[in-house]
Amino acid sequence: MTARVKICGLTRPQDVEAAVACGADAIGLVFYAPSPRAVDLEQARILAAKVPAFVSATGLFVNPERDYVEAVLDAVPLDLLQFHGDESPEFCQSFGRRWIKAVRVREPGQIEQAFADYHQASGLLVDAWDPNRYGGTGQSFNWSLIPESRPLPLILAGGLSSDNVARAIEQVRPWAVDVSGGVEESKGKKDATKLSQFFKEVHRVCKTD
C-alpha cells in the first residue's frame, strides 16, 4: 500500500525544503492566530513559493470568517483548504476550492456521520479530541473508532511520530498521514532528523506491506 504524507504547521522556508526533500506530498500552513504555528500572509507567501509542482500547499483554518479565507486565497497560492473547526458543509463548499474536513474523534459513530455530512470533501482528516484545542494536541486517539468502510480518502492525524507511524499505517491503512508536533524541535520549527526518521518509517512499512 501507499500512504501519503502531509507535514503541517510549517513556519520556516528551510523546513518546507526539508519536508519536500524527504518526499512530502503536502505541506500545511496554519491560518489560525491562536496556534503557535500560525503564519501571516507574508510568511505564507514565502513558504508557498518553496512548494514545487506536484506537492500540495494546504491552508488550515479554524472557524474563520469568510472574508479572511478569501483574503488568504487572494494572497497565497493554496491547492487545498483544510477546515479544522466547526464549519458547516455549506461553508466549506462555498469557496469553489478542493477541501478536506477535520473531525476530532471522541465517540463511536462520529466518523461515519462526518463522512455523510461532508460528502463533498476531498478527504476526511481524523484527529484527537481536546475540549480546549482544535488540533495540534500531540495526542493520539482510539484508532478502533475508525470504520473500515470509507467513502472518502481518510487522513490520519493525532500524535504521530516515527515511533508509531508504522503501526498506525498497518492498523488503520489510511490514504495519508498528517504530522506536526512529532517532527518538531519546538512548536513551528521542524527537526530535519525527525523528519527523515518519520519518512523512513512510512517508506519501510509501505514497502513491506
Swiss-Prot record:
InterPro entries: Aldolase_TIM (IPR013785), PRAI_dom (IPR001240), RibuloseP-bd_barrel (IPR011060), TrpF_fam (IPR044643). One of its GO terms (biological process) is L-tryptophan biosynthetic process. Pfam families: PRAI (PF00697). It catalyses: N-(5-phospho-beta-D-ribosyl)anthranilate = 1-(2-carboxyphenylamino)-1-deoxy-D-ribulose 5-phosphate. The keyword Amino-acid biosynthesis applies. It comes from the Bacteria. Signal peptide: none annotated. Gene3D superfamilies: Aldolase class I. Keywords: Amino-acid biosynthesis, Aromatic amino acid biosynthesis, Isomerase, Tryptophan biosynthesis. Belongs to the TrpF family. This is N-(5'-phosphoribosyl)anthranilate isomerase. It comes from Marinobacter nauticus (strain ATCC 700491 / DSM 11845 / VT8) (Marinobacter aquaeolei).
